[in-house]
A protein has these predicted regions:
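Solvent-exposed interhelical
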Residues: 52-103, 190-238, 242
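C-terminal ends of transmembrane helices
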Residues: 70, 136-149, 201, 264-272
Length: 299
């Protein structure tokens, strides 16, 4: 196979499933904030910012594989870089191109906002969120940075904040950066994803020798306890927006499938079924976001 890589190899490197989730998150944030699908120029802005997120996340994921090359030779030898499907030099070039494309989309989004007669300050929160995400990326694993990836739980939280901010980014794009429903999505994303990141670190313990993940520092059992506590915080984040009438209280019934899935996580963790626990967390979060979306559209 060519060292420049085939299409499927690049999609694997970019973790296209995760990046598309980011795209959905932007639209979800916009829809939840507006209570309807964005139309006209708001739809253009949302699309541009969704493409920006796609390129940003693809760049982040590729960069993560570049820095994790030696670890992936043990944990994931089938990944594009350790398998040789894509050369490191090609990955670095495309990573840079994707990040530049993300920035260009942001500029185009601002030009669209400006054409609507709005001030820069109306859209500025979108740029602030993009810069925060860039800061987290730069300090996650770059040399001579905070190296959050090697700090255990803080690294998991950094990743999860970037995930949660996607929904707020979508709301900010339609000029509603302080929308309470969008920030409810943020909290759900942070707690669910942090719990899942901890569980994934438990799964990767064999290949993480020498890394300072939470699981490596405190052991698998203590890490599972932490993951469960974070899951309970996720449960609170699911229920509280209905209790405080951010969403109509009666619509809490929409969250029942998400809550049931979340409650099943505990037994998986107790039985050391870490992969199953991770899958349940992902399923529960998806069901929760679907519930929030349904509540917003129904009103």
């Amino acid at each position: 196979m060519s060292r420049t890589g085939s299409g499927p190899a690049w999609l694997t490197l970019f973790r296209i499933g995760n990046t598309l989730t980011g795209v959905i998150g932007v639209f979800l944030g916009a829809i939840v904030a507006l209570g309807e699908l964005p139309t006209g120029k708001l739809a253009v802005i949302t699309t541009l910012q969704a493409i920006s997120v796609l390129c940003f996340m693809a760049s982040w994921n590729a960069l993560n594989d570049i820095f994790d090359l030696e670890i992936d030779r043990i944990n994931r030898p089938d990944r594009p870089l350790p398998s040789g499907s894509i050369s490191v030099s090609s990955a670095k070039i495309v990573t840079s191109v994707m990040m530049v494309t993300s920035l260009i989309c942001m500029l185009l989004a601002w030009f669209t906002v400006d054409s609507m007669g709005h001030e820069f300050s109306d859209w500025a929160p979108s740029l602030v969120i993009w810069i925060i995400a860039l800061f987290l990326l730069a300090n996650y694993e770059f040399p001579n940075s905070l190296r959050l990836k090697d700090r255990g739980l803080p690294g998991n939280i950094a990743i999860s904040i970037s995930v949660g901010l996607v929904a707020v980014f979508g709301a900010a794009g339609v000029l509603q950066p302080y929308n309470h429903r969008a920030w409810s999505l943020f909290l759900v994303g942070v707690f669910y994803n942090t719990s899942r990141e901890v569980v994934k670190d438990i799964e990767d313990m064999e290949g993480d020798e020498g890394r300072n993940t939470l699981a490596m520092r405190v052991g698998a059992d203590s890490a599972r306890t932490t993951a469960w506590v974070l899951s309970l915080l996720a449960l609170a984040a699911v229920i509280m927006p209905f209790a405080f009438e951010v969403f109509p209280p009666l619509h809490v019934v929409f969250t029942i499938p998400a809550v049931i899935s979340l409650m099943l996580v505990k037994s998986k963790l107790l039985n050391s079924e870490d992969h199953e626990a991770s899958s349940l967390l992902k399923k529960s979060m998806t069901l929760c976001l679907a519930a929030f979306l349904a509540s917003s559209l129904i009103g």
